């Protein structure tokens, strides 16, 4: 910028030749010039009629060594001495690698004339838009996308675009060049192992990657809903001081248009700073009748939950609605949020109003009125005060008020109010602004005012534009014409002149509005007075967002517009501009029920394009130069009028206003017990009369009271008085599945063709409109296709791009597909192998008569169900007219992968039938386990001869589930510290680093710290340019916000506590000092008085004579303390505070005389203790304090406390280890022991979880500080330039990566299914990190539930149905949780996470009593009432006893039926140490209702059939035996001896020795060793097999069980087993015939085989 300043000074010193004297030459160019784009400029001569040839040239800045473009134009009187040449600046000739802003010099020369202007460059050479086929995807699915590209003239542009896909963490995982003209763009396939969240598809031009365009989409596991729920509040806001209740209407419609019958569960709540605070009492059960229902939030319910309602103003009400169909078959959860809690229903803004006015001339005040949710408020009367004017808002929320301004004023104060007749005066919205008078040049008093009175402007309109002038007569007489420019989309679109007749003060012209002016334009005009003065004005004009061209999608005929049948043939017709390229996609509307925010639309396209407008205001300007600057233009004249130099292509953004902080007080009971006069004692009594969920005696409850003896006495008296009273209820509902015992005439199931094609999107086609256009210039094309099988409404979306009219998004065309009778098979997203699950087939009857339906579940060997290979499962139901019925099927998936479930149904006496076949995803059992290996690639220090080679060993996969896949992802990234820093700046990623929510004085410091350290690091290393200089502003604002908020908790003596009314905390005050001292290096306006006041308080109030610091009030949030809590507390606290004093020393030394002596006393105390410390953590912390004080240079004690000289660890304290090791690193850096620091840094970086976050706050903060200080202290890195080669087994070609500065933060990733050794080599300069993530499924062992440091017991029992229960509850259970801490002292700050049973909700009243009474058992609780998935309750405990069980008990209530309830879980864990945790499961009916299956290891076979055998018939003879043994599917016939019977799980294993192979089969050598026959335990009695007996046995090939190298045999109903008498028994007359038959059977089959 210094070079530019010097250049501008030099330019101003250039003299103008005499021949131009007396004329005014004006040169205008866009304020920002785009590369590779034709840009129009203007040169005008006023007062000179001599023809001239003008040379226009563009040069590099500042040296002007290159001519980037040149042209020559003629200026002559015939053209009005005005020319508008175009210039183009080629990007290829510029230094695009420069991190600094780039400029060019645009020069106009002619004999006797030279004008030039330095103009900012932009590499934005066009617009790119990405359309994805959907806005939401599941793992493993393809993301189809197409690219639309056009230049700034809205002309189609088919140059290459780079498309990148980025994970929610910002990691680029794919980057490919794409030709927008191609219709065969390969989709991006999401991996199965994928990050959930919002992904980005980013497009950028290949030759200008600085400008990018983004499409967003979500990735998560989901199932499409069967219907749509809309929630419509009665108002878009809630009056906080109103008296009326708040109503919401609920509408539920199937996606094919029919109305839903069912029930809705509605829960209201308030969202405060992003955190949801539910109102448990508002949970209501609402009937949905004919698709509609209404819920109400009663005013008194809200006020009971939040006592101080005014604290809610500015926050949002939300309502969560769960709708369940009458059949219980389907459920949809939706939430309506953004219902603002307000004191006035409207908000007024002046966003489209100029800030400047012309005294004595009309001032157009554009008032914009919105509802609290930001939507436009139509038909609202508004009125301005001081200068009276009134109007009414239009549909877009705007109203234009014309104010006639007085003469001779410099500012104009304006107040506008709404004037709604139904609102009292105090509820009318009001907004004030001050407009400033336009400053005339040299105080001439000459003005120009452009007036455009029309508001809703659209293409095809003729817009009147008025030019008003005011000034002295001599000046006005010189005006012969107005020169005007029309700017749109950042370009000068048109230049013209409007003549003015003598004496005309008002001149009007008509401007035709063409599609080129969409979405908005600026109209700027000026006139000249003499040869020096320019008088200018401008106005911004909005144009209705429509297509520049035409695109319509409709049915090709009237038949195509009707309701269609699945699979039917139909046609659509496309109508649009000739030559248009049209992209089509059909999307199931159910997708938009889940997510519609990312759908491409015409408005979104224009919103993006409008950002290319380089103008920054709604019009006008501070003075004549300001008019040009604010319109986005650069001006230079021959009389040295020059606009200011622009240095940013973007307009300056207003600072975000800081939201009002609101501390919401939770409700507490204030009812009174009349017999106790004292209010506090009334509370104790009332709490004593509450029912205790745990069933504790009054005497035990009294032990929890901390309020004193008087309270205990009152509590005990009232508790004993009310003892034994319960108030519960229960209401039973049972789901009854009707069955029919008769068979009738049904359409044959074998003739039913099942529907099986259910895509979420399809019709992904690109069509060209090349047909001859009709008389209206429209081309059309008919597209035939066959519909897919879904019963739904398809939304066909068409997007076109034409050669000259840009992009057009057509109105979606809907195709509704349904049948009068059909099946909807509802499947979960996935199920776990070998775990039972219920699926439902919902049968819909949309005819006017009741029907009888036979339903069949088809057999699939991949599932165990009531349908078997030999027996169909059928059931018959009656469905009433215009209703539905759910038929549940219980299955057990036996094989991993995608498997078909098929259900068919036919209507008795009719040809109506339907079948559905869907794929169900079966995932492996066990628990997903991740193994992360991190390897630092640093060839300069770790390599030999400049190359680092490393063997990466295969992981030990402990307890891997057999026959399951392994996923290994290998990713390589540059400099990891930079990655951590970058993620810390990003607000979304910052939230992942911080566990505790912000709010109180402690939480606020947790939130503020990472930004301070990150900003300090980036400032020191000068890396802001690589991350985006604008992000520093974000970080500084974050720090300032944290600083300002922390001052709320500062006491008068400069100490701090979580809340002002709590005792001051030494640790927190020191922490504030530490963080604020660091913040002064990046935010200079932090007051030294604030920091030094805290230091002085610590010295005077908390330091003892021996130098030690004391803590009288520990912090609430113990996780802040990190490792400082625990053993050796005095040393830890003193060292921590000494570090804070040392880091603030440079700020406070001259303000606090006793600071040095305080530091010396504390350091002396630590020196005496240092060599005797036991904990590695305390040793590291103390070492850093002493090294920072300059008293420690010997690292022997520190290194002796380490493990392997690279870490300081303690048992089961992972996060403390990171923190302690980081303190050790800081100590080594202070001692300048860099060689010792290197392995420490490597260990620290290796501990980072995959994705880049540490586990706990202090560990992250200190770890981050250590790594940042290491980067600062170590010598600067060489330029990053690494070549990495990975050699994977079974891949012939090695994988090669090049990492340099351009892609350092891009994760370059490869995947493999193998877990084998591989090698990696790195050469070059710089560092990189290779992360190997191996994911597999580990078996859940019986000891997997072993708990660490906690004992936990969970039980559940049913409550008597005669007792009272919650309204709408079908069943009530009591959940009891008992836990004990297994450490030496009580555990503090413990969390219990309860995962609810599906369909159940916790009783909020019970939980409130546990948290609100004087006998308080829990600190607080949070409820997540998502019944669609498992809800959860989070319970916070201040402590858990180490000497006795702490028990909690509360009710949970079933609100809807679930066919098969999966177990819930309870997890208890320490907030300070996540390794200390325990999990237990609970279930109301454990061990009941399970299908029978036989398992060996993790392989299971279905056994859901009777225990009858094939040979259990009345009469059997030799011929029947031969006939049955020789049936085609019989695999073997043996004579075998039963050796023993083994029991395993629910199966019996009969171990048999094959004595004779009568008919050989699959088992090639069955006599080699005993064979196992497996049967259900329940069949033991029916089989009645005896050890040491011989048997004739045969079975089917389908009953063989292949397990690796051996075969087992299943005993099923198809198995033939007969006892074969021994030799002695065969002599008896009773068995002689049987023995002869067996011998003859054996001889016949052995010698002759089976007959043909």
Curated annotation (Swiss-Prot):
Q: Does the keyword Hydrolase apply?
A: no
SMART domains attached here? Answer: A2M, A2M_N_2, A2M_recep, ANATO, C345C, Thiol-ester_cl
Gene3D superfamilies, alphabetically? Answer: 1.50.10.20, 2.20.130.20, 2.40.50.120, 2.60.120.1540, 2.60.40.1930, 2.60.40.1940, 6.20.50.160, Alpha-macroglobulin, receptor-binding domain
Task: Enumerate the spans annotated as Anaphylatoxin-like domain.
Answer: 684-719
What keywords does the record list, in alphabetical order?
A: Cleavage on pair of basic residues, Complement system impairing toxin, Disulfide bond, Magnesium, Metal-binding, Secreted, Signal, Thioester bond, Toxin
Cross-link Isoglutamyl cysteine thioester (Cys-Gln), sequence positions? 1000-1003
Q: Name one Pfam family in it.
A: MG4
Taxonomically, the superkingdom here is: Eukaryota
Positions of region (Factor B binding site): 743-754
Pro-piece positions? 657-740, 992-1270
Q: Which InterPro entries does the UniProt record give?
A: A-macroglobulin_rcpt-bd, A-macroglobulin_rcpt-bd_sf, A2M/Complement_sys, A2M_N_BRD, Alpha-macroglob_thiol-ester_cl, Alpha-macroglobulin_TED, Anaphylatoxin/fibulin, Anaphylatoxin_comp_syst
Q: List the disulfide bonds.
A: 547-808, 616-651, 684-711, 685-718, 698-719, 864-1502, 1347-1478, 1378-1447, 1495-1500, 1507-1579, 1526-1650, 1626-1635
Give the residue ranges for region: C3a-like domain.
661-739
Q: Where is this region: C3d-like domain?
A: 992-1270
Molecular functions (GO terms) = endopeptidase inhibitor activity; metal ion binding; toxin activity
Q: How is it modified after translation?
A: First processed by the removal of 4 Arg residues by furin-type protease, forming two chains, alpha and gamma/beta precursor, linked by a disulfide bond. Probably, a cobrin-like protease cleaves the C3a-like domain and then the C3d-like domain, generating the mature venom factor (VF).
The tissues where this chain's protein is expressed are given as: Expressed by the venom gland.
Q: How does it assemble?
A: Heterotrimer of alpha, beta and gamma chains; disulfide-linked. Is active with factor B in the presence of factor D.
PANTHER family noted in UniProt: COMPLEMENT C3, MACROGLOBULIN / COMPLEMENT
Biological role stated in the UniProt entry: Complement-activating protein in venom. It is a structural and functional analog of complement component C3b, the activated form of C3. It binds factor B (CFB), which is subsequently cleaved by factor D (CFD) to form the bimolecular complex VF/Bb. VF/Bb is a C3/C5 convertase that cleaves both complement components C3 and C5. Structurally, it resembles the C3b degradation product C3c, which is not able to form a C3/C5 convertase. Unlike C3b/Bb, VF/Bb is a stable complex and completely resistant to the actions of complement regulatory factors H (CFH) and I (CFI).
Q: Write the protein's name.
A: Venom factor
- Supply the source organism for this entry: Crotalus adamanteus
């Amino acid at each position: 910028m210094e070079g530019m300043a010097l250049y501008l000074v030099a330019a101003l010193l250039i003299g103008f030749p005499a021949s131009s004297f007396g004329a005014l030459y004006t040169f205008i160019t866009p304020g920002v010039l785009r590369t590779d784009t034709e840009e129009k400029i203007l040169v005008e001569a006023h007062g000179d009629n001599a023809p001239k040839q003008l040379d226009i040239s563009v040069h590099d800045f500042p040296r002007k060594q290159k001519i980037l473009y040149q042209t020559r134009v003629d200026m002559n009187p015939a053209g009005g001495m005005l020319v508008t040449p175009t210039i183009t600046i080629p990007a290829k000739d510029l230094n695009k690698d420069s991190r600094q802003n780039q400029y060019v010099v645009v020069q106009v020369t002619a004999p006797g004339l030279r004008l030039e202007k330095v103009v900012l460059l932009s590499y934005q050479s066009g617009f790119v838009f990405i359309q994805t086929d959907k806005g939401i995807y599941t793992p493993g699915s393809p993301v189809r996308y197409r690219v639309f590209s056009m230049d700034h003239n809205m002309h189609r542009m088919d140059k290459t675009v780079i498309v990148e896909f980025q994970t929610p963490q910002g990691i680029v995982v794919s980057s490919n060049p794409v030709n927008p003209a191609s219709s065969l763009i390969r989709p991006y396939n999401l991996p199965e192992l994928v990050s959930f969240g919002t992904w980005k598809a980013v497009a950028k031009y290949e030759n200008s990657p600085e400008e990018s365009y983004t499409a967003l989409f979500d990735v998560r596991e989901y199932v499409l809903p069967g219907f749509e729920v809309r929630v419509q509040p009665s108002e878009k806001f809630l009056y906080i001081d109103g008296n009326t209740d708040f109503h919401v209407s609920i509408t539920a419609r199937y996606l094919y248009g029919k109305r839903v019958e069912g029930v809705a569960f509605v829960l209201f709540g308030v969202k405060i700073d992003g955190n949801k605070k539910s109102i448990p009492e508002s949970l209501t059960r609402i009937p949905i009748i004919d698709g509609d229902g209404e819920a109400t939030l009663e005013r008194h319910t809200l006020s009971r939950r939040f006592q101080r309602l005014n604290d809610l103003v500015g926050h949002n009400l939300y309502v969560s609605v769960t709708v369940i169909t009458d059949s219980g078959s389907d459920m949809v959860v939706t939430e309506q949020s953004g219902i603002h809690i307000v004191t006035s229903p409207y908000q007024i803004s002046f966003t489209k109003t100029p800030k400047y006015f012309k005294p004595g001339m009309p001032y157009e005040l554009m008032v914009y009125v919105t509802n609290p949710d930001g939507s436009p408020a139509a038909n609202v009367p508004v009125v301005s005060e001081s200068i009276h004017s009134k109007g009414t808002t239009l549909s877009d929320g705007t109203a234009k008020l014309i104010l006639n301004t007085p003469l001779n004023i410099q500012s104009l104060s304006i107040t506008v109010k709404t004037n709604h007749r139904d609102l009292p005066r105090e509820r009318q919205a009001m907004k004030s602004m001050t407009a400033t008078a336009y400053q005339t040049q040299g105080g001439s008093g000459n003005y120009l005012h452009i007036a455009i009175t029309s508001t809703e402007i659209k293409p095809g309109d003729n817009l009147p534009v008025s030019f008003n002038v005011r000034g002295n007569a001599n000046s006005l007489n010189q005006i012969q014409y107005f020169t005007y420019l029309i700017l749109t989309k950042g370009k000068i679109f048109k230049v013209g002149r409007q003549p003015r007749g003598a004496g005309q003060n008002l001149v009007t012209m008509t401007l035709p509005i063409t599609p080129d002016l969409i979405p908005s334009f600026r109209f700027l005009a000026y006139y000249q007075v003499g040869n020096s003065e320019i008088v200018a004005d401008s106005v911004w004009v909005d144009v209705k967002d429509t297509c520049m061209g035409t695109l319509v999608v409709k049915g090709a005929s009237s038949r195509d517009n009707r309701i269609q049948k699945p699979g039917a043939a139909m046609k659509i017709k496309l109508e649009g501009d000739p030559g248009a390229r049209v992209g089509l996609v059909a999307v199931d509307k159910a997708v938009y029920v889940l997510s519609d925010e990312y759908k491409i639309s015409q408005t979104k396209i224009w919103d993006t394009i409008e950002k290319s407008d380089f103008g920054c205001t709604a019009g006008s300007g501070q003075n004549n130069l300001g008019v040009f600057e604010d319109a986005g233009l650069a001006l230079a004249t021959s009389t040295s009028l020059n606009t200011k130099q622009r240095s940013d292509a973007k307009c300056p953004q207003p600072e975000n206003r800081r939201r009002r902080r609101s501390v919401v007080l939770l409700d507490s009971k204030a009812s009174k017990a009349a017999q106790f006069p004292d209010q506090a004692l009334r509370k104790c009594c009332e709490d004593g009369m509450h029912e205790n969920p745990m069933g504790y005696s009054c005497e035990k409850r009294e032990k929890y009271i901390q309020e004193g003896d008087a309270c205990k006495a009152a509590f005990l008296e009232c508790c004993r008085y009310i003892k034994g009273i319960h108030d519960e209820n229960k209401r039973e509902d049972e789901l009854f599945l009707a069955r029919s015992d008769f068979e009738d005439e049904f359409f044959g199931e074998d003739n039913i063709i099942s529907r099986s094609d259910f895509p979420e999107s399809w019709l992904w086609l690109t069509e060209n409109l090349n047909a001859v256009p009709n008389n209206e210039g429209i081309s059309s094309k008919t597209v035939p296709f066959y519909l897919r099988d879904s019963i739904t409404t398809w939304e066909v979306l068409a997007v076109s791009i034409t050669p000259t009219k840009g992009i057009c998004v057509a109105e979606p065309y809907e195709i509704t597909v349904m049948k009068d009778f059909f099946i909807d098979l509802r499947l979960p997203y996935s199920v776990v192998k070998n775990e039972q699950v219920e699926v439902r087939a919902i049968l819909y009857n949309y005819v006017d008569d009741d029907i009888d339906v036979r339903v069949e579940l088809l057999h699939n060997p991949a599932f165990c169900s009531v349908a078997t290979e030999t027996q169909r499962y059928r059931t018959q139901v009656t469905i009433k007219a215009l209703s539905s019925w759910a038929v549940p099927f219980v299955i057990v998936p036996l094989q991993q992968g995608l498997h078909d479930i098929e259900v068919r149904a036919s209507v008795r006496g009719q040809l109506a039938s339907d079948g559905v076949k869907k794929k169900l995803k079966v995932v492996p059992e066990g628990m997903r386990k991740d193994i992360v290996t991190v390897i630092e690639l640093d060839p300069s220090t770790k390599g030999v001869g400049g190359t680092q080679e490393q063997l990466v060993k295969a992981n030990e996969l402990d307890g891997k589930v057999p026959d399951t896949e392994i996923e290994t992802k290998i990713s390589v990234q540059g400099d990891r510290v930079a990655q951590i820093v970058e993620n810390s700046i990003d607000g979304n990623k910052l939230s992942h680093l911080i566990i505790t929510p912000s709010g109180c004085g402690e939480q606020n410091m947790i939130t503020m710290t990472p930004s301070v350290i990150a900003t300090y690091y980036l400032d020191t290393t000068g890396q802001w340019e690589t991350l985006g200089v604008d992000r520093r502003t974000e970080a500084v604002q974050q720090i300032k916000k944290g600083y300002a908020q922390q001052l709320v908790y500062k006491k008068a003596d400069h100490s701090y506590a979580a809340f002002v009314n709590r005792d001051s905390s030494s640790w927190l005050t020191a922490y504030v000092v530490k963080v604020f001292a660091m913040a002064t290096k990046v935010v200079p306006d932090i007051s030294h008085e604030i920091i030094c006041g805290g230091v002085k308080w610590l010295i005077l109030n908390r330091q003892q004579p021996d130098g030690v610091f004391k803590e009288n009030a520990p912090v609430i949030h113990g996780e802040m303390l990190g490792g400082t809590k625990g053993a050796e507390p005095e040393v830890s606290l003193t060292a921590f505070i000494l570090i804070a004093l040392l880091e603030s020393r440079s700020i406070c030394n001259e303000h606090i005389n006793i600071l040095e002596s305080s530091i010396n006393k504390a350091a002396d105390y630590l020196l005496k203790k240092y060599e005797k410390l036991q904990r590695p953590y305390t040793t590291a912390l103390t070492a850093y304090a002493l090294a920072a004080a300059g008293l420690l240079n010997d690292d022997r004690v520190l290194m002796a406390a380490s493990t392997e000289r690279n870490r300081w660890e303690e048992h089961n304290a992972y996060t403390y280890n990171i923190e302690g090791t980081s303190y050790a690193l800081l100590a080594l850096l202070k001692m300048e022991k860099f060689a010792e620091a290197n392995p420490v840094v490597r260990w620290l970086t290796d501990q980072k979880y995959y994705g880049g976050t540490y586990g706990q706050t202090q560990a992250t903060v200190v770890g981050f500080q250590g790594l940042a200080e290491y980067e600062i202290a170590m010598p600067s890195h060489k330029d990053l330039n690494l070549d990495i080669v990975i050699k994977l087994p079974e891949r012939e070609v090695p994988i090669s990566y090049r990492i340099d500065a351009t892609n350092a933060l891009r994760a370059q990733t490869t995947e493999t299914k193998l877990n084998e050794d591989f090698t990696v080599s790195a050469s070059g300069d710089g560092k990189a990190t290779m992360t190997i993530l191996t994911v597999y499924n580990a078996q859940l062992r019986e000891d997997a539930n072993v708990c660490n440091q906690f004992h936990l017991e969970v039980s559940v029992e049913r409550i008597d149905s005669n007792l009272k229960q919650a309204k709408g509850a079908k069943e009530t259970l009591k959940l009891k949780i008992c836990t004990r801490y297994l450490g030496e002292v009580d555990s503090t700050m413990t969390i219990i996470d309860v995962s609810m049973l599906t369909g159940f909700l916790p009783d909020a009243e019970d939980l409130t009593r546990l948290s609100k009474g004087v006998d308080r058992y829990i600190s607080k609780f949070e409820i997540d009432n998502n019944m669609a998935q498992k809800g959860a309750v989070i319970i916070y405990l201040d402590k858990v006893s180490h000497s006795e069980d702490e028990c909690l008990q509360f009710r949970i209530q079933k609100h809807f039926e679930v066919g098969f309830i999966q177990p819930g879980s309870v997890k208890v864990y320490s907030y300070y140490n996540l390794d200390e945790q325990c999990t237990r499961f609970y279930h109301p009916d454990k061990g009941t209702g399970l299908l029978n299956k036989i398992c060996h290891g993790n392989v299971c076979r279905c056994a859901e059939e009777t225990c009858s055998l094939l040979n259990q018939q009345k009469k059997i003879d030799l011929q029947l035996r031969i006939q049955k043994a020789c049936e085609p599917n019989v695999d073997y016939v043996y004579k075998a001896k039963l050796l023993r019977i083994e029991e395993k799980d629910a199966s019996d294993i009969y171990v048999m020795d094959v004595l004779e192979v009568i008919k050989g089969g699959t088992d090639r050598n069955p006599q080699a060793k005993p064979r196992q026959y497996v049967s259900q335990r329940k069949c033991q009695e029916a089989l009645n097999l005896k050890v040491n007996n011989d048997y004739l046995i045969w079975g089917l090939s389908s009953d063989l069980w292949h397990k690796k190298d051996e075969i087992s045999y299943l005993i099923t109903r198809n198995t033939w087993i007969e006892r074969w008498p021994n030799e002695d028994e065969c002599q008896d007359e009773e068995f002689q015939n049987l023995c002869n038959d067996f011998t003859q059977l054996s001889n016949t089959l052995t010698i002759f085989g089976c007959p043909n």
